[in-house]
Amino acid sequence: MEANVTIPIWQNKPHGAARSVVRRIGTNLPLKPCPRASFETLPNISDLCLKDVPPVPTLADIAWIAADEEETYARVRSDTRPLRHTWKPSPLIVMQRNASVPNLRGSEERLLALKKPALPALSRTTELQDELSHLRSQIAKIVAADAASASLTPDFFSSGSSNVSSPLPCFGSSLHSTTSFVISDITEETEVEVPELPTVPLLCSASPECCKPEHKTTCSSSEEDDCISLSKASSFADMMGILKDFHRIKQSQDLSRSLLKEEDPAVLISEVLRRKFALKEEDISRKGN
């Protein structure tokens, strides 16, 4: 028997290498039936627009609906697409044709619009926040000015000359910003050249221990301690030169306090209110005595 013998297809075995190519494709790539298209019949559509054509849609209408550019008046193949500026349908036709098939593209756009962040709302929120911060700064200025004017009344200096001569406690940068714009309204001082500071730090405001509760008595005591330590370290220096440097440092410190910029309005308001209530408590204690 010859090796190259042609075997007809109908004599091939239904399995193995001689199996049909169609069966191989069907086994490796199973095909599922396509979903059936469902249609909705409009009530009394034959009396309105369909006279000679039967109102039965076909599969060609599916492609028409998919290619629809947000038009709700052409839903079946028998309809004619008029121009937008010439077509003036009656309200009944518009309601019936819009109810036949929903406009899926419009609903998708509405969903995307809901998912996207509202840019106008965000811009409005930022504008409100900026306006609120501006109002807070204005309120801080008004409260600080009122507190400073109340502190300069004769009742504040009635306790004696000790309160006038003693420096104010170190409340931090917020108190410095309070006095910065109040002093300019009371007295106008000429600008003084700030001398060069020595290498040894003698400023009370530069040390963080000044704002602690145990160091809130006076700033003069800490400056005297620094001066004593400096004199002990430099025993061969002239005492008069040290006192002159100390006086210059004190003047530059007062000038720097008056030139400080405004800080956070919230911190300024809280500090002014705290001072105001402290003054009220002092007045009550004086009246009780």
From Swiss-Prot:
Keywords: Membrane, Mitochondrion, Mitochondrion outer membrane, Phosphoprotein. It is found in: Mitochondrion outer membrane. Phosphorylated by AMPK. Upon stress, phosphorylation at Ser-100 and Ser-235 by AMPK is sufficient to induce mitochondrial fragmentation. The modification Phosphothreonine is found at T27. It is a peripheral membrane protein. The keyword tRNA-binding does not apply. The modification Phosphoserine is found at S38, S100, S107, S221, S222, S235, S258, S270. Its main location: mitochondrion. InterPro entries: Mtfr1 (IPR007972). It holds the Pfam family Mito_fiss_reg. GO terms for cellular component: mitochondrial outer membrane. Mitochondrial protein required for adaptation of miochondrial dynamics to metabolic changes. Regulates mitochondrial morphology at steady state and mediates AMPK-dependent stress-induced mitochondrial fragmentation via the control of OPA1 levels. Belongs to the MTFR1 family. This is Mitochondrial fission regulator 1-like. It comes from Mus musculus (Mouse).
